A protein has these predicted regions:
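Adenosine-phosphate binding glycine-rich loop
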Residues: 237-238, 243-284
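Positively charged, low-complexity intrinsically disordered leader regions
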Residues: 1-37, 41, 110
Length: 284
């Protein structure tokens, strides 16, 4: 589908318009740049329309309507709901009462749409991801690392996580890893994770709404910064990925994110194409 768009303008719809006559409601409980724009563009390219709902502008967000009642109304109005939320429980509750598909646009537990874009970006750059080695540096217990661990099982790649013990994946995740025989290595040494890897990934050290001492967390994670010296330990054709927004000079240096191995801008673009596939899959 992406290849078929090569000669089309950015705002032009796909020729087959599979989402024509349909609409998506997007609820943003957290600020967003890429998720908001990419889903909006994705629905339009598929021939449909989107409605953006901010909590401070709807009854559910104001607390004078239950989530259940809001979900039932949305079922009557639209074909799909996308929710970006601080609480995964909200996502599960909406799913319980909706009679239409709901997409996780980000929660405190996972960020699956971003990971699908990352897989697409890797395979465009370096071929099949199966059997390859990805290194994750920084917080090993956030929504991105959780979804990456799940993806390692689905797409059969090797995953190495370098993180302080304090920020290791939680016990529930590790139990799932053991049960599903995921090829996961956890280390406190960044060099060990990155050595001979095919892709190096990281994320902002302090996420939105993190109830932590920001400066203390940054200090703990300082030695897990992705820099040129660390990237040199990866394979020569290894790529660097980051979901954005980025803390330049913190989790990654300018030299790396703006360097030849960085694919972060294509990664951001691929949010549109990955999410188009997700929307279409929901309707098929």
């Amino acid at each position: 589908r992406k290849l078929k768009r090569q000669n089309l303008n950015k705002s032009a719809p796909d020729e087959d318009k599979p989402f024509e006559g349909k609409s998506m409601a997007m609820i943003f409980e957290k600020p967003s740049t890429r998720t908001r724009m990419s889903f909006d563009i994705a629905t339009k390219q598929l021939g449909g329309s989107s409605i953006i709902l901010n909590p401070d502008g709807i009854h559910y967000g104001k607390g004078d309507e239950t989530l259940k009642d809001t979900a039932k109304v949305l079922t009557e109005y639209v074909d799909i709901v996308m929710l970006r939320t601080s609480s995964h429980k909200n996502l599960e509750e909406f799913g319980k009462y909706l009679n239409i598909p709901i997409i996780n646009g980000l929660s405190d537990v996972g960020h699956p749409c971003q990971i699908m874009s990352d897989i697409l970006t890797y395979e465009e750059s370096n071929g099949t991801i199966k059997g390859k080695t990805l290194a994750w540096l920084g917080d090993g217990n956030n929504n991105m690392s959780n979804s990456l661990i799940e993806a390692a099982g689905k797409f059969e790649f090797n995953l190495r996580i370098a993180c302080p013990k304090k920020y290791s994946p939680n016990k529930k995740i590790l139990s799932w890893v053991k049960k599903n025989k995921i090829n996961l290595t956890i280390t406190v040494k960044p060099d060990e994770a990155v050595k001979n890897s095919d892709c190096v990934m990281t994320d902002k050290w302090v996420s939105m709404n993190d109830k932590v001492n920001k400066e203390a967390k940054k200090k703990i994670l300082k030695s897990f910064q992705v820099n040129k010296k660390l990237m040199s330990k990866a394979n020569s054709d290894a790529i660097f990925m980051h979901c954005l927004p980025v803390g330049r000079g913190e989790e990654v240096t300018d030299e790396v994110i703006d360097g030849k191995q960085s694919v972060v801008w294509r990664q951001a673009l691929n949010r549109v194409h990955a999410q188009k596939s997700i929307i279409k899959w929901c309707l098929d």
